[in-house]
From Swiss-Prot:
<dbReference type="InterPro" id="IPR052154">
    <property type="entry name" value="KRTAP_type_2-like"/>
</dbReference>
<dbReference type="GO" id="GO:0005829">
    <property type="term" value="C:cytosol"/>
</dbReference>
<dbReference type="Pfam" id="PF01500">
    <property type="entry name" value="Keratin_B2"/>
</dbReference>
<keyword id="KW-0416">Keratin</keyword>
<protein>
    <recommendedName>
        <fullName>Keratin, high-sulfur matrix protein, IIIA3</fullName>
    </recommendedName>
</protein>
<comment type="function">
    <text>The keratin products of mammalian epidermal derivatives such as wool and hair consist of microfibrils embedded in a rigid matrix of other proteins. The matrix proteins include the high-sulfur and high-tyrosine keratins, having molecular weights of 6-20 kDa, whereas the microfibrils contain the larger, low-sulfur keratins (40-56 kDa).</text>
</comment>
<dbReference type="GO" id="GO:0045095">
    <property type="term" value="C:keratin filament"/>
</dbReference>
<dbReference type="InterPro" id="IPR002494">
    <property type="entry name" value="KAP"/>
</dbReference>
Length: 131
């Protein structure tokens, strides 16, 4: 489709083409073919320092705190400091859904939307609770 999406291989739209390992579930992230490979008896296994994400119709990477720190966003709004593929939970203020920190693990108030909280208790951030 002219993108890096696909189960194994895609076109030249991502830095000269890319390979996507089968264990990597993100349909819009790839590994460039220029990455170092290791010869195996049957296949070549790509090894990269980090995957490269490209924009999609619907973002598949996330930045729950909207801080572009530590979590992956589409490459059009992803800074160089974005390295993680798995997003961390946010810390949330007590009475509202505004994130106050990315010190995890923390939870958000049950009234917050859209995503549910993975934990029911929070660590404290300095002297104030996260939620």
């Amino acid at each position: 489709t002219g993108s890096c999406c696909g189960p194994t291989f895609s076109s030249l739209s991502c830095g000269g083409g890319c390979l996507q390992p089968r264990y990597y579930r993100d349909p819009c992230c790839c590994r460039p073919v220029s990455c170092q490979t290791v010869s195996r008896p049957v296949t070549f296994v790509p090894r990269c320092t980090r995957p490269i994400c490209e924009p999609c119709r619907r973002p598949v990477c996330c930045d729950p705190c909207s801080l572009q720190e530590g979590c992956c966003r589409p490459i059009t709004c992803c800074p160089t400091s974005c390295q993680a593929v798995v997003c961390r939970p946010c810390c949330w203020a007590t009475t509202c859904c505004q994130p106050v920190s990315v010190q995890c693990p923390c939870c958000r108030p049950t009234s917050c939307q859209p995503a549910p909280c993975s934990r029911t208790t929070c660590r404290t951030f300095r002297t104030s609770p996260c939620c």
